[in-house]
């Protein structure tokens, strides 16, 4: 919303197919899309942003039990069959990992860059490192790192307890020579705002998460669009080697 408040035209694409959370965060958890008109889906508008998510297509209690290729087809449809109109920025919320969805996105559109979100513990650092290296392989710039769950702040206190460890995001930023965009501690009021769909209201706009968004905005707006888009991204027959073909 920091971008929308700066009068930019913003879209949010939630491609966490198996666990979409954006609809709840913007107060549209019960919203369901109607059918496509002539094969085109209209994004939902909230807080000055256009939003599309699997959460608008399936009810809360409906599990999405899809194999990777089907999920990849949905990503392609969200990119090509949604009437986004004219946008300055399209932000994509991806699931954790380095699977079909990430590869499909990398193959389908040229991306300005990626922001890596991790948590402080060592095991999360290892997983984030794989994501960092994947984006490097497909030549997508990494704009910076955000450390989530960076300590617990009890209600009515400013003291931070590092119950999940400390420094995982900073360590990754130093290892890969990347900007550390900020740290988000666990706060009851922020959790309640996300659950209630009020995280983007005026009462919460000065939260630490919003301040980090402003910092990220400065990085993104200074990053030129990557002119590179891979011609083909596939897994080799051994199931372990990523094969990337670039245009001449």
Language model region names:
Residues 246-248:
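Conserved aromatic anchor
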Residues 84, 88-89, 95-192, 196:
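Conserved catalytic-core segment of NTP-binding enzymes
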Residues 194-206:
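C-terminal boundary of histidine-terminating zinc-finger modules
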Residues 14, 22, 52, 75, ...:
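Residue-level signature of catalytic and energy-coupling elements of molecular machines
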